[in-house]
């Protein structure tokens, strides 16, 4: 079964699946080839930085940038690329880059995977230092790449993340139909 056959979650948009592409602590940007289901090395980060948390996407979604909805999963351990995590969205980071609007849904593992995050309901519940690390990473990780840039615009709440996932599911269905 390919990732395109994996539903967007157990009860989306509140209970989602995230296909992990990049493990926490990696300085390598991996990307899943949607046609083959194979994970490729997209590039090594040019900066002396690493992904602060696991990073992936919600299957069967299509964001405004033409890719599946991106998700940064706050967790305690790195997860191998290709693994699927059951998650709960808590908010979103709105950004802009050289290609246009680029939003990142922020999520935590579902309570059945790790109850440590059961008290985190929105990004506002995250420690300030965690939000600052995420913002700092995305503001700087492309800096040394020619022609690339990122501007972090603002944090959005849980409802915005849910709407982004819903829209991604609808876009995917429309695109698949025709």
Curated annotation (Swiss-Prot):
Keyword Hydrolase (UniProt): yes
Keyword Lyase applies: no
GO cellular component: cytosol
Pfam families recorded: Pyrophosphatase
InterPro entries found in the cross-reference section: Pyrophosphatase, Pyrophosphatase_sf
Biological process per Gene Ontology, one example term: phosphate-containing compound metabolic process
Subcellular location: Cytoplasm
Binding site for substrate: 29, 43, 55, 141
EC nos: 3.6.1.1
Reactions accelerated catalytically: diphosphate + H2O = 2 phosphate + H(+)
Keyword terms of this UniProt record: Cytoplasm, Hydrolase, Magnesium, Metal-binding
Residues that, per the record, bind Mg(2+) 2: 70
Gene3D superfamilies on file: Inorganic pyrophosphatase
Residues holding Mg(2+) 1: 65, 70, 102
Cleaved signal peptide residues: none
Any one GO molecular-function label of the UniProt entry: inorganic diphosphate phosphatase activity
Cofactor(s) of this protein: Mg(2+)
Subunit structure: Homohexamer.
HAMAP family, alphabetized: Inorganic_PPase
Its job: Catalyzes the hydrolysis of inorganic pyrophosphate (PPi) forming two phosphate ions.
Family according to the record: Belongs to the PPase family.
Name used for this protein in its record: Inorganic pyrophosphatase
